[in-house]
C-alpha cells in the first residue's frame, strides 16, 4: 500500500522537539560540509535555536565574517544596480512624456492654423512653409478626387456594356427562334401532301396524274 505524503508541522512536545533539532542540525551541518568540499563552494550556515542559542558553520576556505561582508557587498551592488536601472527608466519615461507633450502642442497649433487661427504668430518663413504644405495637400486631394471620379466613370461604363451584352443576347435568342420556325415551315412544305377524305392524295405542283376510271 502506498504511503501518503508526510505533513511537516511543528512538534508540540518540547523534549521530542529538542531531540529532533539535535539530529537534524547535525545532519544539516554534515550536508553543508560535504557540499563545500565536493563542489568547492564558499558556504556559511547560521542557526538560532528555539532558545536563541547560536550554531554556525563555515567552509574551511573562508570565514563567517568574510562571507557576511561579501554578502553585504553583493546586496549593495545589486541594490545600486537596480536603483540605477529604475532611475534610467524613470528618466526615459520623463523624456518620452515631454516629447509627446511637445508633439501634442504642435498638433494643436497645426489644427488652429488650418482653421485660420494663429497665423499672426508665424514668421514669414513659417507662413511660406505652411503655404507650401497647403498647396501640396491640395494637389494630393485633387489627384485623389480625379482618381475617384475616373473609377466611378469606369464602373458606369462597365455596367452599360454589361447591359448591352445582355440585350444582344436576348436579340440573338429571338433570331435563333425565328430561324428555327422558318426551317420547320420549309420542312413541312417539302414533306408529301396528306390524303383527302376520299383516300386520294392531292396533286403536287408540276406533276400530272390521272384518276383511273372505275371498271
Curated annotation (Swiss-Prot):
**Domain MADS-box residues, every copy:** 1-61
**InterPro entries noted in UniProt:** MADS-box/MEF2_TF (IPR050142), MEF2-like_N (IPR033896), TF_Kbox (IPR002487), TF_MADSbox (IPR002100), TF_MADSbox_sf (IPR036879)
Mainly localized where? Answer: nucleus
Q: In which tissues is it expressed?
A: Expressed in bud pedicels, petals, anthers, style, ovary, seeds and embryos.
UniProt keywords (A-Z) are:
Developmental protein, DNA-binding, Flowering, Growth regulation, Nucleus, Transcription, Transcription regulation
> Which residue range or ranges hold the K-box domain?
90-178
GO BP: fruit development; fruit morphogenesis; integument development; negative regulation of cell growth; positive regulation of transcription by RNA polymerase II; regulation of timing of transition from vegetative to reproductive phase
The record's subcellular locations are: Nucleus
Q: Where is this region: Disordered?
A: 143-172, 184-215
GO annotation, cellular component aspect: nucleus
Please, which domain of life does this record's source organism belong to?
Eukaryota
Q: Name one GO molecular function term.
A: protein dimerization activity
Q: What does this protein do?
A: Probable transcription factor involved in the regulation of fruit growth. Contributes to integument development. Controls organ size via cell expansion. Involved in the regulation of longitudinal growth of the fruit evenly throughout the radial axis. Functions redundantly with TT16/AGL32 to repress nucellus growth and promote its degeneration.
The miscellaneous annotation reads: Plants over-expressing AGL63 are dwarf, have few rosette leaves with a curly-leaf phenotype, and display small disorganized floral structures and addition of carpel-like, resulting in small abnormal siliques with few seed production.
Query: Assembly state and interactors?
Result: Forms homodimer. Interacts with AGL16.
The name this protein goes by in its record: Agamous-like MADS-box protein AGL63
Q: Could you tell me which species this protein originates from?
A: Arabidopsis thaliana
Amino acid at each position: 500500500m502506498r504511503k501518503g505524503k508526510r505533513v511537516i508541522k511543528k512538534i508540540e512536545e518540547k523534549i521530542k522537539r529538542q531531540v529532533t533539532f539535535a539530529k537534524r542540525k547535525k545532519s544539516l551541518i554534515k550536508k553543508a560540509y560535504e557540499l563545500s568540499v565536493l563542489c568547492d563552494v564558499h558556504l556559511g550556515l547560521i542557526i538560532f535555536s528555539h532558545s536563541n542559542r547560536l550554531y554556525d558553520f563555515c567552509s574551511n576556505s573562508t570565514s563567517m565574517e568574510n562571507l557576511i561582508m561579501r554578502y553585504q557587498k553583493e546586496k549593495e551592488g545589486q541594490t545600486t544596480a537596480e536603483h540605477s536601472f529604475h532611475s534610467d527608466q524613470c528618466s526615459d519615461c520623463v523624456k518620452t512624456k515631454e516629447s509627446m507633450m511637445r508633439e501634442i502642442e504642435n498638433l494643436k497649433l497645426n489644427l488652429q492654423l488650418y482653421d485660420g487661427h494663429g497665423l499672426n504668430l508665424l514668421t514669414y518663413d513659417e507662413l511660406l512653409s505652411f503655404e507650401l504644405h497647403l498647396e501640396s495637400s491640395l494637389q494630393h486631394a485633387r489627384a485623389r478626387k480625379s482618381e475617384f471620379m475616373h473609377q466611378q466613370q469606369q464602373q458606369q461604363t462597365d455596367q452599360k456594356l454589361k447591359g448591352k451584352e445582355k440585350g444582344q443576347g436576348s436579340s440573338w435568342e429571338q433570331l435563333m427562334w425565328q430561324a428555327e420556325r422558318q426551317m420547320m415551315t420549309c420542312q413541312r412544305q417539302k414533306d408529301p401532301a396528306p390524303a383527302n377524305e376520299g383516300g386520294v392524295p392531292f396533286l403536287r405542283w408540276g406533276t400530272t396524274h390521272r384518276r383511273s376510271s372505275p371498271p
